[in-house]
Amino acid sequence: MNTRINRRTLTLIPRFLVLGSLLLLCSKVAGQQMYQLTQFMLNNYTVNPAVVGTHNYFQARTNHRFQWVGMNDAPITNVVSVYGPLTKSPMGFGALFYNDITGPTSRTGLVGSYAYNIALTDEIRISAGLSVGFMAFRVDASKFDLGDNTNYATDPALLTFQSKTSIVPDAAVGVYMYASHYYVGASCQQLIGNTLTLYGHPVRENALRRSFYAHGGYLIYLSENFDLEPSVIVKWSPPSPFQFDLNVKATYLTRVWAGISYRHLDAVSFMIGYRHDNRILFGYSFDFSYTRLRAYTGGSHELMIGYQFDKLK
């Protein structure tokens, strides 16, 4: 009798390990569900759909982030966006794709955006925007490693544990007020707040919680060749605490820039970038964590590449 109980317990151990790992990953994602970019100020569309149509040209941006380099299964994020105005109309549209991977879990999303802007004064305009699309949350069972003695092909506890994907609709809204030398905006991501369903059960611990953003920046002309742009972003995803980034970016001849950023309770970042022929942009940032993570990671790297199309007439 005791032997049977022990064998059954041993058989169930791999399943408990898998489910425990999944719950830990879910709790991690719940704390930081939205992807994180250090160079957000170079592409505010990633945090606010109202930004589309606020420039008189189309632009494309790609961001590639490698977070906590040196740690196993650390997050890797890729974002691609294209957006711009509708010719001779106070509106714009765009599309954004992202893929955010953390160990055996990944979040992939695609949204289309529309925004309409009006003039408040001769200098100031305000835009309201909406994004609608989908998000796919995937658990890749092949990336779980339970040790050399586990037979994934024949173990009855693992036969039913396979890769699963939960696809849900997603949406975001935002407002954005801007002038030639400053901007301020607010948005809500994951507006619908869906609950993911995996293995036939809703994973309520990993419900898509609404995330609120407030961001702004101010351009200061120091001289004919130099300008300075401080910016800030505040993020809140209840019940998680507020988080904010403070940034300062200095630009020379509108071509070369360097900056520093402070992320509350997380990291200090350094940024450099170059604009070629007023069309192609290259940006790089490095995050140095000042938390306990600094003992286990070599920092976070992020690369941004952009292209600016001709101005619309």
Model-derived regions: residue spans:
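Subset of outer-membrane beta-barrel
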Residues: 32-313
